[in-house]
Curated annotation (Swiss-Prot):
Protein name, as recorded: ATP-dependent Clp protease proteolytic subunit
Described function: Cleaves peptides in various proteins in a process that requires ATP hydrolysis. Has a chymotrypsin-like activity. Plays a major role in the degradation of misfolded proteins.
EC number: 3.4.21.92
Main location: cytoplasm
Active-site residue list: S113 (nucleophile), H138
Molecular function, one GO term: ATP-dependent peptidase activity
Enzyme class: hydrolase
Gene of this entry: clpP
Keyword vocabulary terms for this entry: Cytoplasm, Hydrolase, Protease, Serine protease
Localization, UniProt: Cytoplasm
Xref: InterPro entries: ClpP, ClpP/crotonase-like_dom_sf, ClpP/TepA, ClpP_His_AS, ClpP_Ser_AS
Record-stated family: Belongs to the peptidase S14 family.
GO cellular component: cytoplasm; endopeptidase Clp complex
Amino acid sequence: MSNIDLSASSNLNVENTLVPMVVEQTARGERSYDIYSRLLKERVIFLVGQVEDHMANLVVAQMLFLEAENPDKDIHLYINSPGGSVTAGLSIYDTMQFIKPDVSTMCIGQACSMGAFLLTAGAKGKRFCLPNARTMIHQPSGGAQGQASDIHIQAQEILKLRERLNEIMAGHTGRGVEEIARDTERDRFMSAHESVEYGLIDKVLERRVGGE
């Protein structure tokens, strides 16, 4: 079966880049971390680029690790993604709902398609965008090939997934399922403040305040 995708059509492949290292002094001497591992110690997870199986497995593993480390402390998920695979995204979504800690979500840059779906899946009251971030919602898409009967089966699967995604998004945004279905017929782009009005997020953060 072909992979069903929920992503912005203009996405770009993210090239591997040099990851900065952080050196800390400890009682046992110097210890170095890559920047993402150091931020993981602060319970920060980055969801960056295309949502696909390998990336989803890493995000899920990090959430499970942080839950085991402290089940009562929030996890902070920073999202900058054009979207991607529906099944990979749903594995992240289900884990967010399954684990004990609240998962706070923050859009930096863009949260499109499956990225927007995961953004709105954060704990109520803890879903944020930076002021110039953009979000976009639309319906899933997928390519099908083979015999006519196979194409029909795959088309039915896409329709079932679309219905389920609309139901989930309706629950998180407070919108009706029919309204979500209409709004996702085509690409719907929103600014950070429009995302608040729609119910995708709870607040636009312009500056860190207190424990935010």
